[in-house]
Amino acid sequence: MQNKAKIIIPLVVLVIVIVSIATCTGNSSIFVQWEPVAIQNSNNSIKLKVYIENSGSMDGYMRQKSEFKDAVKSYVNALDLKVDTTELYYINTQISSFKADIAKLEEALNPASFAKCAGSRSNSDIADMLNNIVMRTEDNSVSMFISDCILDVPQGDAVNFFGVKQTNVTRTFSKALNKHPKLGVEIIRLSSTYQGMYYYAKGCEPIESKRPYYIWMIGNKELLGRLNKKVALTTIQHGYDNYVAFSSTTNVPFDIATSLKKHMIKGNLNVKGQYVFDFMVDMSETLQEEATLMSSRNYVSSTGRNVSVSGVENVKQGAEYTHILTLAISKNTKPCSETISFAPPAMPTWVDEVNDDSGRDIRKNMNKTTGIKYLIKGVSDAYKDNTNLATIDFRIKNN
């Protein structure tokens, strides 16, 4: 009996030790529990309002076969097929309706048509134009603003001038956000052959070269997101150079494909010993371009290192969801509530790189735009409290 006891006692101790080790090393499985956030498939009508600046500085883009005309025509036509109504306007100090329909858009893009419109073509205040456009943007409409976005620097204190314009733009969009909290803004930088007069505060000179111009898309982020899912930026003929967008925080529509029971799923172990989960998400309302959405560095866990986005996969254009996020959760993670936030950099570096502060010597600044960073930073300041563009909420459980 004593010999049996000597054998049994060590075996019991060994079993206890093994169980203890398994428990302490977090050998339990990781589950995720969630409540799906549904995609809002709205059938509400969308009205597209296109505003083309017709100040004198825009004439140089209007030559036959210019990239400007090709790009505007291709993008407006593609969007027109996805909206219910499209309205065309010229804009300078006043807003004038086009005397042509979409089919004849290219014919209307010429200096002669521009000159027939009301308002002053001799000077342009982009901040005022943006204010007029934003005030006319409704919950069911998307406004497209096409302009060279040059701020006409007066003689004197240019720094103060730019600061005033930036403040004016911030005020415009801050007031609009108070009224329309879902307002979003996309700014696309493009380039085109330019052949015409370049205007300074005093005088002008002829140039023939590639020059930048901009397309702004302003409207309810849900509508902008819907249009982006149907009409990609790659639709624009000759492509685009740069992009930046601003939006309020979105509780991202998401789901997980399969589960053991309702809204709960066990993760699969990867080679690193982490439990992984694939989340189907619709990131369209963030308005960010694909490179930003595909960077896992822009996704942040609220609980720290134990949870991370290890991969991002895009879904084909036109699908209900836009991306698949792969989440990796360490096996020793304790049960908790978790939030994944999408927090990309607020301002891309290109905004400073393409800006000109002088308003002089265009031949040394052919690829730059006078004052553009102050317009864009004016918009950015209106959205400064929205550091997270999207959130995904769920719970981590284990057995």
Task: Give the predicted meaning of each segment.
Residues 4-49, 56-61, 390, 394-399:
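Acidic, polar low-complexity linker/tail segments
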Residues 64-75, 114-131, 157-177:
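Well-ordered, non-membrane alpha-helical segments in soluble/globular domains
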Residues 254-399:
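Extended non-globular C-terminal regions
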